Amino acid sequence: MDVERHHAIAPLLAEWAALHDADDRATPYGTAAWARAAVEHGCAGGEPWVLTVRDGGRLVGLMALARRQRASMRVLRPLGDEHADCWDVLALPGMREAVERRLAAELRHRSGEWDALVLTHLTRSATVAESLTRGGLHARSHDGLPHPHVALPETFDAYLARFPSERRRRMRKHLQPLDRGRVTARTVPPAEVADAVACLLDLRQRQWAHVGKALLPALAEERFRGFLTAVATELVPAGLASIVEYADEGAPVAVYLDFMDARAFHGFMGGFEPGAARLEPGKLHILASNRGSIEAGRAWANLGRGGEDYKQWFRPEPFVSRSVAVTSGRLRSRAALVAGTLAGRLR
């Protein structure tokens, strides 16, 4: 297997997309579309530093990183991880172990090009941290925010059966406005993506302001609006993202943007009119999305990083977002790990 390092991602995008489609553990956050939007809209996290693994010329693995200067250290992080919910190496099924072994060797070989590697929000099934350790790199893992996932059964009735009767009654009551037609859900077509993203961000800002909170600064920046619009413009037609607009008696009141594939639903972001809070649009959307994902045959509904109390209402599995800090073996890199810099201040 041959490994190359790339600073320009444009020549890789077509092969990247094909590899992502073939990877049975990939998520929408690992798409070529996500990477391209991150680079084009200043959300990459630094200069692209992408390792590709080829077997006989065929792309069989890809590690999408970005390198930036942090004080005196050159830090590698997942490309576009500022807004991604989870991350992993891309690899063809059956070749992941060999790909990760080869990537670990290449990172050691290129240790003069970086001082620290910080892999954040690893997927539940990620094995790259263990592969890097076996490859002779020094790593320190730590648990981050809760990352609740709901295991989806074969039917929605089976999902409801997990709950006490009073909770089942309340869940069905939450869905009644949608099921009886008072509230309607419209999937936004590709031609309306840009307007829908703008509406979502406006609603979210007003929703938070109504309760005396401010959005995270990064979410209020124009670059985030451009990034999210670019991602949705590519992934909505591909079936890897969906924007749903909810209307109450004909008046639009909420917009939600989520990502999905054949295996899992990834809740991402939404916003609603403060006056519609009585409908609890968030709970309504999660319940409707869980029901739709069950009908689509998905196995998991990812509720996003964070331990907010409302997520426990849906009885998720208690997964935790895991990160790993890796040193290049050089003196200042080892010293930073000992001091806890990589696992702490570099998050």
List the model feature ranges, each with a label.
Residues D2-G56, V60-P78, L122-H147, T155-F156, ...:
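A conserved beta-strand-loop-helix scaffold within acyl/acetyltransferase catalytic domains
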Residues G112-L119:
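Short secondary-structure capping/junction motifs at helix and strand boundaries
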Residues D88-P93, R186:
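Acyl-group handling in specialized metabolite and lipid biosynthesis
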Residues R77-D85:
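Residues forming anionic-ligand binding surfaces in small-molecule and nucleic-acid pockets
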Residues R334-R347:
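C-terminal secondary-structure termini that scaffold catalytic or DNA-interacting sites
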Residues L119-T127, L303-D309:
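Conserved beta-strand-loop-alpha-helix junction that forms the acyl-donor binding cleft
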Residues V50, R54, L62, A84, ...:
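Aromatic (often tryptophan-rich) hydrophobic motifs at membrane interfaces
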Residues A91-G94, V150-L152:
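Short beta-strand-to-loop capping motifs
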